[in-house]
Swiss-Prot record:
Cofactor note: Binds 3 Mg(2+) or Mn(2+) ions per subunit.
Keyword set includes Lyase: yes
Enzyme type, top EC level: lyase
Comment on protein domains: The Asp-Asp-Xaa-Xaa-Asp/Glu (DDXXD/E) motif is important for the catalytic activity, presumably through binding to Mg(2+).
Entry cofactors: Mg(2+); Mn(2+)
GO BP: diterpenoid biosynthetic process
Protein name stated in the entry: Santalene synthase
SUPFAM superfamilies cross-referenced by the UniProt entry: Terpenoid cyclases/Protein prenyltransferases (SSF48239), Terpenoid synthases (SSF48576)
The enzyme's E.C. designation: 4.2.3.82, 4.2.3.83, 4.2.3.81
Pfam families, A to Z: Terpene_synth, Terpene_synth_C
Reactions that this protein is recorded to catalyse: (2E,6E)-farnesyl diphosphate = (1S,5S,6R)-alpha-bergamotene + diphosphate; (2E,6E)-farnesyl diphosphate = (+)-alpha-santalene + diphosphate; (2E,6E)-farnesyl diphosphate = (-)-beta-santalene + diphosphate
Native species: Santalum spicatum (Australian sandalwood)
Length: 569
């Protein structure tokens, strides 16, 4: 978006100095709890304007991008050593260009996989680690035993490796692709983490020090690819072996995809303000956060249907969540859940106006999305949506009963319900409905398969680690940390370490699920991984979803609003 366009529209952020919460429910004198969420910092006039005033990519840039794409294809086709091929794939993926070169990447990785008999990587820590990570990442199994050559007879990693920072960093990143029970990778992670932490401040190469610091904050396997691409484009520009063709194409492609996303944001913002849900004082008004999450899950332009429907269902879901958490009485919530189970508006007149509005928004939007899927995909997804909504609201209902009854469940009971109440089974099923092969394939998501189970459980636990203090202050349902404290008598610090350990172990299980879930193909496997990565983005350092004026706004603005400067042609 150029400066004239930005001036003609409004600023992306809004000043809430004079903000007054609007209350829809004037027919009830009953005292209601409030979520105490601050109003959205995002200016909805600005967001709606993106439908027209999005970042238009100039024709000369489109032509240049096609030319550069051809040059990169030639790179893939040129003879090169296996390590060079892996490094090309790694850079292309981290720059966010993998959607442009899916075939070339698969062919390159499969050729490296087939070329494994001569052990060309043997004794080379960086090559062994990069090969392991990239091949496992794309579903080609490599055993952990490839790292035995770097261990002593006592199974400890060789201290000589500490001087090989690039190799240590590659080992560190590879270790997060481990499965449960892979002890060599556990040792690799501990070893690499310890010595990278000790060394990074003294690394002479600035680009390498920057990479190490970034990785220690959060490993690549746990990062949102689209956000990582924005960061890596800037970091890559400073690297000593930077390829200018790849860098230029990455900048152009990033802006081209961002333009598509901006247009979608504008159209979705127009829909959102017509629902009236943005005026509810007790609920989060988080359309752009919902879009960021859908973009985390499925940023590729070809997943427009999945992306938009995840935002629509997710935005309504957030308000339904807040209604169960802080607004409705137990009797009202029981009646709401009953109406969802029947999928009927017949008896919602018994509900207060606000809950009627929420129910009708949920009901109508779900049916609209079902109609769109029928039109664009040719099958009926509404029965699958209804099943997911019923399970969602029953999970909310159970949490509300715990709260109103003053009950603190054991951690296991909480977790089994919480992996549904977090909302990701519903959101991922929404994404799956948008990409399924046919209507019969929709049966695969009921009952919940392991892939969805573990990705949703991870999102629940990561969410709890970030939001528990805020939600406890509001008097909401207890979270996993507090369930464990109540069950065992542990301190909060000990409980947090325990939940952190569960998160790490469940990541290993999810990694293995990506190989074992043969009934699902790409891209749904990646959708699940990306949903957890989105949770790390929003909750790793607190509540970056509910608290809109947080560290996340900087990344959201750089990914969704601000194009990358292209400099001189």
């Amino acid at each position: 978006m150029d400066s004239s366009t930005a001036t003609a529209t409004t600023a992306p952020f809004i000043d809430h100095t004079d903000h007054v919460n609007l209350k829809i429910d004037n027919d009830s004198s009953e005292s209601r709890r409030m979520g105490n969420y601050k109003p959205s910092i995002w200016n909805y006039d600005f967001l709606q304007s993106l439908a027209i005033h999005h970042n238009i990519v100039e024709e000369k840039h489109l032509k240049l991008a096609e030319k550069l794409k051809g040059q990169v294809m030639s790179m893939f086709g040129a003879p090169m050593e296996p390590l060079a091929k892996l490094e090309l794939v790694d850079v292309v993926q981290r720059l966010g260009l993998n959607h442009q070169f899916e075939t070339e990447i698969k062919e390159a990785l499969f050729s490296v996989y087939k070329d494994g008999s001569n052990g060309w990587w043997f004794g080379h820590l960086h090559a062994t680690s990069l090969r392991f990570r990239l091949l496992r990442q794309c579903g080609l199994f490599i055993p952990q035993d490839v790292f035995k050559t770097f261990q002593s007879k006592t199974d400890e990693f060789d201290m000589k490796l500490c001087d090989n920072i690039k190799g240590l960093l590659s080992l560190y990143e590879a270790s997060f692709l481990g499965w449960k029970g892979e002890n060599i990778l556990d040792e690799a992670k501990a070893f690499a983490t310890k010595y990278l932490k000790n060394a990074w401040e003294n690394i002479s190469q600035k680009w390498l020090a920057k990479r190490v610091k970034h990785a220690l904050a959060l490993p690549l396997h746990w990062r949102v690819p689209r956000i990582e691409a924005r960061w890596f484009i800037e970091a890559y520009e400073q690297e000593e072996n930077m390829n200018p063709t790849l860098l230029k194409l990455a900048k152009l492609d990033f802006n081209m995809v961002q333009s598509i996303h901006q247009k979608e944001i504008g159209e979705l913002a127009r829909w959102w303000v017509t629902t009236g849900l943005d005026k509810l004082a007790f609920a989060r008004n988080n359309l752009l956060q919902s879009y960021m999450w859908s973009c985390a899950i499925a940023s590729d332009p070809k997943f427009k249907l999945a992306r938009e429907t995840i935002v629509e269902i997710g935005s309504v879901l957030t308000v339904v969540d807040d209604a169960y958490d802080v607004y409705g009485s137990m009797d009202e919530l029981d009646h709401y859940t009953y109406s969802v189970e029947r999928w009927s508006c017949v008896e919602i007149d018994k509900l207060p106006n606000t809950l009627k509005l929420i129910f009708m928004s949920m009901f109508n939007k779900t049916n609209e999305v079902g109609l769109r899927v029928q039109h664009e995909r040719g099958y009926n997804g509404i029965p699958t949506f209804i099943k997911a909504w019923v399970e969602q609201c029953k999970a909310y209902q159970k949490e509300a009963r715990w709260y109103h009854g003053g009950h603190t469940p054991p951690l296991e009971e909480y977790s089994l319900n919480g992996l549904v109440s977090i909302g990701f089974p519903l959101l991922l099923i929404t994404g799956y409905i948008a990409i399924a092969e046919n209507e019969a394939a929709l049966d695969k998501v009921h009952p919940l398969p392991d892939l969805l189970h573990y990705s949703s459980l991870l999102s629940r636990l990561i969410n709890d680690m970030g939001t528990s203090p805020d939600e406890m202050a509001r008097g909401d349902n207890l979270k996993s940390i507090h369930c464990y404290m109540n069950e065992t008598g542990a301190s909060e610090e000990v409980a947090r370490e325990h939940i952190k350990g569960i998160i790490e172990e469940n990541w290993k299980i999810l990694n293995q699920c990506c190989f074992d879930q043969s009934q699902f193909q790409e891209p749904f496997i990646t959708f699940n991984l990306n949903s957890v990565r989105g949770s790390h983005f929003f909750y790793e350092f607190g509540d970056g979803f509910g608290v809109t004026d947080s560290w996340t706004k900087v990344d959201m603005k750089s990914v969704l609003i601000d194009p990358i400067p292209l400099g001189e042609e």
